[in-house]
Each structure stands twice: as structure tokens, then as C-alpha cells.
Amino acid sequence: MSETLLTLTGVQTRIGAYHILHGVDLTVTRGNLTMLLGRNGAGKTTTLRTIMGLWRASSGTVSFAGRDITALPTPQIARLGIAYVPETMAIFADLTVKENMLLAATHARHVGDMDEARLKWIFQLFPAVEKFWNYPAGKLSGGQKQMLAVARAIVEPRELLIIDEPSKGLAPSIINNMIDAFAELKARGVTILLVEQNINFAKRLGDDVAVMEDGRVVHRGSMAAFAADEVLQQSLMGLAI
């Protein structure tokens, strides 16, 4: 029987005078990759930021592994085993790739303090991280920066990985690398929640799908069923069929 890892129930979020989320109900199954889709302005990024405590829910609850995390501060949420990669990637451009990785490794002050086996595995997932180890992160390409951002998020073991638009602006070869990496993370038991605009990327990778519109989740189901129903895709996403 599938186990729910993350649950949002009736979540509403207001930012100043703006009421952005209007009662979001969402479940993420442990071990699955859930795609959160929707047009621009649907509330996807706000949902991720609300999960992470970066913006506070004005009502409703966010639960992780059976624990109410709605009011927890962001650092405490992260310590529960949740990593978040925003669309801006959150890397330090003036630091080297190595220094970026060290900053993400909470208990390591030197490379020698890092989990050697895990670091080797990350290098296998993202060869660019090893190749450009001593390069300033700001000189990397967009795809290489995205790889570094995800590598930083998994430098320590995580139960849940949340990423906002990982395929945005990436070349097809980098997208394929990302798909392989996410598949490997899933194989290692990491649960993943991705926001995406690239429907083809989403179809190739997702187990489950939730579609947002006007601050609400208006569709939930399997990605296989969603991918097979072009009329549903067109009605929810405005896609040409």
C-alpha cells in the first residue's frame, strides 16, 4: 500500500494584499515523483515556498511524514530531510563549485569531511560538478548551474527533494542528464516534487501529476493517464493537440 509523505490540506496563502493560494489540497506519495503543472501564475511556486515555510500559510495545514510543519521555520523544515531548489538555483556565483558543495554539507568544513562514497555518486550523476570542481560557479553554463544546484541539494541524504522548473532553458542533452539523475534518485528512495512547464519533460519522468489553476489544484492523478489524454491536457494546460 502506498504511503503519503507530504500532504497539503486547504492551504491558503496571502502575500500582502494578494490572495494567491485558495485552498490547495495536494498529496505526495513516498518514493514517487510528482509533477506539479499549471500555467504561469497558477500558484505553483507559491505552493513550494509555502511548503518550505518561506511564505506562511494563512490557513490550512502542511504535513510531512505525519507531522504538522505549517508553522515551522525554514531551517527546521530542511533539517527534517527536505531540500528545495528554487528556480533561481540558489548557488553562490563568486564561490567555486567545491565551495558551493561544502556550504551545503552541514557537517563538513573540508572536502575530506564529506561522505566520500556519496560525493563519488554525485559525480557520477553530474559529471560537470567534478569537471568544474575548482571553477567559479558564476562561470558555468545554465545547465551546469542547474546540475550544481541539484547536487548541492543532495550532498546530504534527503527524504524529499522539491525543485522549481529544473528543465527551464536547458539543452536537450542536459535535460536527458537530469531525467537520468532523477530516475537514480528515485531508485534510491528519494521522493521528488517538481514544478514544470515543459510538458514533454513531465511526461517522461512523472509518476503522479497535479495541475494547478488560479491558486487551486484542479486535477490529480497518474501521469500515465494524464499523458494519454490529450483533451485533458489541452483543457488544463492550454496545449495544442
Give the positions of each predicted feature.
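Conserved ABC ATPase signature
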Residues: 136-140
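ABC-type ATPase nucleotide-binding domains, specifically the catalytic core motifs of the NBD
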Residues: 16, 97-117, 125-127, 221, ...
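The feature captures the beta-strand-to-loop junction immediately N-terminal to the Walker
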Residues: 37-39
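A short, proline-enriched helix->beta-strand linker immediately N-terminal to the Walker B motif
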Residues: 154-159
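Conserved ABC transporter NBD signature motif
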Residues: 60-68, 80, 114-119
